Each structure stands twice: as structure tokens, then as C-alpha cells.
Curated annotation (Swiss-Prot):
<dbReference type="GO" id="GO:0005737">
    <property type="term" value="C:cytoplasm"/>
</dbReference>
<dbReference type="GO" id="GO:0005840">
    <property type="term" value="C:ribosome"/>
</dbReference>
<protein>
    <recommendedName>
        <fullName>Large ribosomal subunit protein bL36</fullName>
    </recommendedName>
</protein>
<dbReference type="InterPro" id="IPR000473">
    <property type="entry name" value="Ribosomal_bL36"/>
</dbReference>
<dbReference type="GO" id="GO:1990904">
    <property type="term" value="C:ribonucleoprotein complex"/>
</dbReference>
<keyword id="KW-0687">Ribonucleoprotein</keyword>
<dbReference type="GO" id="GO:0003735">
    <property type="term" value="F:structural constituent of ribosome"/>
</dbReference>
<keyword id="KW-0689">Ribosomal protein</keyword>
<dbReference type="GO" id="GO:0006412">
    <property type="term" value="P:translation"/>
</dbReference>
<comment type="similarity">
    <text>Belongs to the bacterial ribosomal protein bL36 family.</text>
</comment>
<dbReference type="Pfam" id="PF00444">
    <property type="entry name" value="Ribosomal_L36"/>
</dbReference>
<dbReference type="InterPro" id="IPR035977">
    <property type="entry name" value="Ribosomal_bL36_sp"/>
</dbReference>
Length: 37
């Protein structure tokens, strides 16, 4: 999980979602998981 100011999809399988008001990226590749902090 990476915590970043700007959350962007890295590959085609990355999905940008909102959970509890925070923007997150979920992906098949665990290295691509990000959340906004």
C-alpha cells in the first residue's frame, strides 16, 4: 500500500474507488494499491 497525495491508476486493471471519503486504487497487482493521505 502506497500513501500518496496524487493517486493515479498505473495499469489497465487499476480501479479508482472511494472508501469512507478517501480515494483509493485497487488492482490485481498488490504493488499498485494506493490510498490518498
Amino acid at each position: 500500500m502506497k500513501v500518496r497525495a496524487s493517486v493515479k491508476p498505473i495499469c489497465e486493471k487499476c480501479k479508482v474507488i472511494k472508501r469512507k471519503g478517501k480515494v483509493m486504487v485497487i488492482c490485481e497487482n498488490p504493488k499498485h494499491k494506493q490510498k490518498q493521505g
